[in-house]
């Protein structure tokens, strides 16, 4: 199942939590949305064993209140110490129970579900759930993960090659991303693909990224800016003819090689078409 925000709102997240029966593992960059916190609180009252793990120092943010509110739910709570270093983050956005996993682009705050373009994907694939469970348990316990990763998952550190394979797939690709950044392998792949690439970024993009835009435009990459008052592009997606990517990864060196990030590759034609249609609608609203 694919959910598109802000249209879908917070309901899919709350529903996922409400459906948990025995346990629920949540790993997000930060969590402050009240309906989600309330759903967690009710899940614990039902007897669900809830574990929540967040980043310890999200960029330009204090988590003092966030930590307090999460602990008040009664959930088991940890800062991801494996990625609690300078300029390194636990930027993942996923949760899972014993039979379902949700992977997406949204931080669990009010803006994600009311103002942002975000995508969330749910799956019942047992192998994907098993991989995510092992990753979560390792990070939660502060142990380096060295296990098997399902081939449909895009997990950082070490996600560069899978992102390059998304860019290099035959045919045109459509990208929505909050930022670009100077990471030569990604920029070279985009430049090489040239006019077969369309990219939507928020109009509030940094001056540094504006230089990257000018570089890519020299290679005929088509780039448009989405006015922030319309919808804020926080999503990270790559949509092609054969497959699509949704995940937490930005296309930067740190995101792909240092952070904990989680994404998913989708091969379902119906969902790919849904993503394409949303991109085309967004493209028409850009400048």
Residue spans for each PLM region:
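HKD-type phospholipase D/PLD-like phosphodiesterase module
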Residues: 1-21, 27-168, 195-269, 276
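Class I S-adenosylmethionine-dependent transferase superfamily signal
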Residues: 40, 187-190
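Long, repeat-rich segments with strong aromatic
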Residues: 177-179, 184-188
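Charge-patterned, long linear interaction tracts outside catalytic cores
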Residues: 278-287
